[in-house]
Amino acid sequence: MSFSNGNMASYMTSSNGEEQSINNKNDIDDNSAYRRNNFRNSSNSGSHTFQLSDLDLDVDMRMDSANSSEKISKNLSSGIPDSFDSNVNSLLSPSSGSYSADLNYQSLYKPDLPQQQLQQQQLQQQQQQQQQQQQQQQKQTPTLKVEQSDTFQWDDILTPADNQHRPSLTNQFLSPRSNYDGTTRSSGIDSNYSDTESNYHTPYLYPQDLVSSPAMSHLTANNDDFDDLLSVASMNSNYLLPVNSHGYKHISNLDELDDLLSLTYSDNNLLSASNNSDFNNSNNGIINTADTQNSTIAINKSKVGTNQKMLLTIPTSSTPSPSTHAAPVTPIISIQEFNEGHFPVKNEDDGTLQLKVRDNESYSATNNNNLLRPDDNDYNNEALSDIDRSFEDIINGRKLKLKKSRRRSSQTSNNSFTSRRSSRSRSISPDEKAKSISANREKLLEMADLLPSSENDNNRERYDNDSKTSYNTINSSNFNEDNNNNNLLTSKPKIESGIVNIKNELDDTSKDLGILLDIDSLGQFEQKVGFKNDDNHENNDNGTFSVKKNDNLEKLDSVTNNRKNPANFACDVCGKKFTRPYNLKSHLRTHTNERPFICSICGKAFARQHDRKRHEDLHTGKKRYVCGGKLKDGKPWGCGKKFARSDALGRHFKTESGRRCITPLYEEARQEKSGQES
């Protein structure tokens, strides 16, 4: 059983005799007789159809031929007799066979009260369903899907419009509407004009132009579908619509979209120069023809040859266009073949600029940098630029600075050889230090103050000695005259006999060895060697010199070291200068009487660390420094005496026996130096 309208009909059946007796029994009998006749006439067919046209319900009932003999009551009404319920049950019961009934509900206009109530309920349900559908439709945002068909092409849209649409489009899209009337036009988004005014848009457009700023919909929360509806990707359209930064052109309503999509043109209908001159930059609809020139859009493609040039058409004439509406568009760029020429040449006749373009086949990727460097054929005889010259000057200046610095470093390395050697000696063991000193001839001669000098140095020393002696005699004579005039008693210095004998012996040995000694400086030499202090030999071995003697030794060392290394480190207390900061630091401890280095055996304190090491060697009894060695020719020299400290070996070389020990080593060094000078 099916109902056409999709609504279930309610049939009221009751066993109440009073309600069933309302209808006329005669009518019931007539109807039943009429339907029996129809049933008998159609009993021969397989399915039987009953058309209930006189009632409000049309029931088509089909049943099998096996159950066709069953008597069924056909009175279907709200006021039907008792047989209706039984007949319907017999039709729908599974024991009576398979039946199918199609009930088409048409209308139920019954005078009784229950039927009217049913109608009102049905109407209320229908109204509620309609309201729900309307609410759902209002919640949904209307979208427009523009699908591209097989025949549709964007080139048809991008081609210019014809003359009949152009004025209306330009006035509609670009210029504000002068015939605006806010009272006669609707402000809805789906209207034809959509001139809505809102605080969400720019105030510079009045009335609000949705081409530049689409209105915000109150049905959606910034849905992107609405923005897509108002945007069309046109790339480079000639409709002169305003284009945003993303390359889209906006439309305000569906009519503008229809006008945009209805303009279809073929790809072969390219505009000529005369037709394109009719365009104009119509921000206000009219533009002066004197301000525009005859520019054209056309791309003439020719076959790429081996040697090509590019023609850039530039209009030279300033004559106005014959049309009153012209829009500035892209000029013509055409590629044509030419045979020769390197640089662009302007043709005065047609106003074209010829540019040479290399062949793509012969132009390899390795020549991409040719634009950045000049060709050899063009710049063979040209000089270097100022930048190149300055760059070369900088390089040459750096080379000169490097050479000078190398020379200075070599000189300083030679001058600081002794200091570096001494610094290295502090980092090595005492045994290695003793061996290095014994093998170093210059160091041994320096310890004995017997460094060989050249002939020039000898002549200079002789000249200095002569001048000193003459100066001393003059001063002594003048001093004696002054003393005689002033009657002052003076005592001449007396020299002990032992010291005089030693000086004479040293003078004789110096003549034999070729050593020049200044007799006047023997007083200093005497203090250094300590001839008068015979009682202090043990103290000298123990390293207990007085401060005065140590200062004299440091002066002598500084004099010898100044020949090679300049004394740049001065003491702030006494002004004494030293060649190394370590010596200055050790000297400052003499002023403060600071002795941080203590002997681990006897507890004696020293100001220098190497002094403590030398002192500790005395306790151990090791004697590492030996007077002796071998010359280059293999002959031995020295007496073979051993000393615990290097300064003791140096003092031994300064004695008479020590001079004799070191004489062969000195003679070897002097001969080598004289041979080098000759």
From Swiss-Prot:
GO terms under cellular component: cytoplasm; nucleus
Biased composition (Basic and acidic residues): 429-446, 457-467
Other remarks on this protein: Present with 1160 molecules/cell in log phase SD medium.
Zinc finger residue ranges, C2H2-type: 569-591, 597-619
Compositionally skewed regions (Polar residues) per UniProt: 1-21, 166-195
Source taxon at top rank: Eukaryota
Name the record gives this protein: Transcriptional regulator CRZ1
Phosphoserine PTM positions: 175, 245, 385
Cellular location(s): Nucleus; Cytoplasm
Gene Ontology biological process terms in this record: cellular hyperosmotic salinity response; cellular response to alkaline pH; cellular response to blue light; cellular response to calcium ion; cellular response to pheromone; chitin biosynthetic process; intracellular potassium ion homeostasis; monoatomic ion homeostasis
Main location: nucleus
Organism: Saccharomyces cerevisiae (strain ATCC 204508 / S288c) (Baker's yeast)
SMART domains assigned to the protein according to its UniProt record, in alphabetical order: ZnF_C2H2
InterPro entries: Snail/Krueppel_Znf (IPR050527), Znf_C2H2_sf (IPR036236), Znf_C2H2_type (IPR013087)
The keyword DNA-binding appears for this protein: yes
Residue spans of biased composition, Low complexity class: 34-47, 410-428, 472-486
PTM comment, free text: Phosphorylated. Dephosphorylated by calcineurin which leads to rapid translocation from the cytoplasm to the nucleus. Phosphorylated by the cyclin-CDK PHO80-PHO85.
Annotated region described as Disordered, given as residue ranges: 1-50, 159-195, 401-486
Functional description taken from the UniProt entry: Involved in the regulation of calcium ion homeostasis. Binds to the calcineurin-dependent response element. Transcriptionally regulates PMC1, PMR1, PMR2A and FKS2.
